[in-house]
């Protein structure tokens, strides 16, 4: 299969939003449907493949390269492992905290994989990328035109939406030069009031779609404790079917758009409209009450 036919997608999202869990469960469902997939973990935590491999954390390309002296000293079989439903699994890794650029591992890993034929005979390559910041390194799959479809995992919480808007801004920056497009928002529910409606509204403001609303279910945590995807742990569960629906939506998705990020003021107005944030009047009232309490305790 030629590289042109491979769909290269990327999951971005705020740290802690459940991005890696959502992406692995979705990839597992896609693999069940016969799709040939490789996951390239681009998060320094190296947790993008552990549910597929039933392991704590896969040894990363950058870690092995540091041990050997150079990435050229590695063999593909050492870093490319096969997981659930024959999904290929790679973790790029990153430097020690406080030293160097974590994005460097992504650049090194992708170049190594391409040069060693890892992209052959695939339908999808999925990049799992840290998305609190879209700096040069973490934007590499977007900037270099590797990932063509971006899926943002978010929720109805303010910081998750803030990160989603920032990621959309990063996609816009490279949309014309690299051809990258936003495939949609995936709402990983936190049971925020009016969450479905809120994320649908945000998606429209960003000129995209809410691709799927993933309900909150403790079975996800039960599967994670066993280092398994829900599709493997409880294949007949409602949650496994939710991931299958999401997987099919990604496979069928043709709605790839150039995003229209909003300003911070517009995002705050949206949160006020949906009752996530208080308006200026409520803010001033709360501040006055706090000041009153402080005066009475002095």
From Swiss-Prot:
Look up the record and name the cofactor or cofactors this protein needs. Answer: [4Fe-4S] cluster
What modifications follow translation? The reversible ADP-ribosylation of Arg-104 inactivates the nitrogenase reductase and regulates nitrogenase activity.
Q: Does the keyword Oxidoreductase apply?
A: yes
Q: ADP-ribosylarginine (modified residue): where?
A: 104
Q: Which residues bind [4Fe-4S] cluster?
A: 101, 135
Alphabetical keyword list? 4Fe-4S, ADP-ribosylation, ATP-binding, Iron, Iron-sulfur, Metal-binding, Nitrogen fixation, Nucleotide-binding, Oxidoreductase
Q: What is its EC number?
A: 1.18.6.1
Cofactor note (record)? Binds 1 [4Fe-4S] cluster per dimer.
Give one Pfam hit by family name: Fer4_NifH
Cysteines paired by S-S bonds: none
Residues bound to ATP are 13-20
Catalytic reactions of this protein: N2 + 8 reduced [2Fe-2S]-[ferredoxin] + 16 ATP + 16 H2O = H2 + 8 oxidized [2Fe-2S]-[ferredoxin] + 2 NH4(+) + 16 ADP + 16 phosphate + 6 H(+)
Query: Its Gene Ontology biological processes?
Result: nitrogen fixation
* Record carries keyword Signal: no
Protein task: The key enzymatic reactions in nitrogen fixation are catalyzed by the nitrogenase complex, which has 2 components: the iron protein and the molybdenum-iron protein.
Q: How does it assemble?
A: Homodimer.
* Name under which the protein is recorded: Nitrogenase iron protein
Organism (species) = Cyanothece sp. (strain PCC 7425 / ATCC 29141)
**High-level lineage:** Bacteria, Bacillati, Cyanobacteriota, Cyanophyceae, Gomontiellales
């Amino acid at each position: 299969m030629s590289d042109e036919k491979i769909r290269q997608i990327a999951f971005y999202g705020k740290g802690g939003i459940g991005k890696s869990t959502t992406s692995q469960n979705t990839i597992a469902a896609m693999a069940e449907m016969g799709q040939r997939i490789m996951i390239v973990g681009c998060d320094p935590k190296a947790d993008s493949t552990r549910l597929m491999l039933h392991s704590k954390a896969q040894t990363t390309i950058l870690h092995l390269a540091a041990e050997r002296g150079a990435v050229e000293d590695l063999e593909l079989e050492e870093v490319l492992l096969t997981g659930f439903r024959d999904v290929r699994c790679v973790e790029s890794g990153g430097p020690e905290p406080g030293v160097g650029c974590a994005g460097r591992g992504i650049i090194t890993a992708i170049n190594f994989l391409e040069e060693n034929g890892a992209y052959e005979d695939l339908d999808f390559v999925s990049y799992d990328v840290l998305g609190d910041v879209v700096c040069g390194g973490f934007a590499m799959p977007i900037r270099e035109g590797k990932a063509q479809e971006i899926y943002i995992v978010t929720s109805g919480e303010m910081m998750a939406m803030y990160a989603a808007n920032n990621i959309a801004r990063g996609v816009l920056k490279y949309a014309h030069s690299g051809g990258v497009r936003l495939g949609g928002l995936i709402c990983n529910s936190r049971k925020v009031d009016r969450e479905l409606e809120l994320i649908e509204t945000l998606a429209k403001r960003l000129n995209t779609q809410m691709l799927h609303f993933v309900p909150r279910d403790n079975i996800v945590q039960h599967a994670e404790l066993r280092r398994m995807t829900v599709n493997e742990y409880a294949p007949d569960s409602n949650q496994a079917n939710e991931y299958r629906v999401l997987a099919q939506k990604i496979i069928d998705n043709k709605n790839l758009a150039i995003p229209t990020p909003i300003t911070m003021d517009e995002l705050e107005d949206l949160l006020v409209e949906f009752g996530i944030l208080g308006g200026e009047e409520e803010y001033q009232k709360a501040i006055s009450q706090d000041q009153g309490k402080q005066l009475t305790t002095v």
